[in-house]
Amino acid sequence: MFTGLITGLGTVREVSSVGGGKDARFVIAVPTGNAEWSNIAGAKLGASIACSGCCLTVIERGDDAFTVEVSAETLAFTTLGTWQPGSLINLEASLRLGDEMGGHLVSGHVDGLATVAGATPENGSTRWRFIAPPGLARFIAPKGSIAINGVSLTVNEVQDRNDGSNATEFGVNIIPHTAAHTNFSALQPGDKVNIEIDMLARYVARLQSFPHG
């Protein structure tokens, strides 16, 4: 379990194929000079780390990097399939008992991919707009929580596009600190991002799908 508060910006160092070429192994370098990640060599094998919102298992670790393996399904349904050496990765270690709950509960199970529609300056911050993936728009509500590339954010508005596409667009505000310490700084219109909808919205929708009585 995670909170959506990114504690470091990692970099993909190596990418290799495993499992007959369908799965992938990534070596991710942790940020230097960051106390949160200075002891990655001491991380337990099997530990969970959220990498741009996707919960991954540490299978190897060294002085300044850790290694994860990713299945073909995860590669196909998340941004991980586009990772290459140099890609910037939002990092968060799993929540521990007693840690501050500063964001919202994030499982690290990506629900789908949203598309960057654009970004505009707004009163010192930046309003980012995304096109929601089909089937997930109904879970996204104004003032609700959403994780984008693992970052806990509040939805500002949700609106249907009037361009005949039947797509739904939603917006969030990113302050300069968040932009500087996450991979939002590298996003461009048309890019895909991992999103995880709020757990409460997911369970409410599931309950409503059953007959009342």
Give short role names for the model-derived ranges.
Residues M1-G213:
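Conserved loop->alpha-helix
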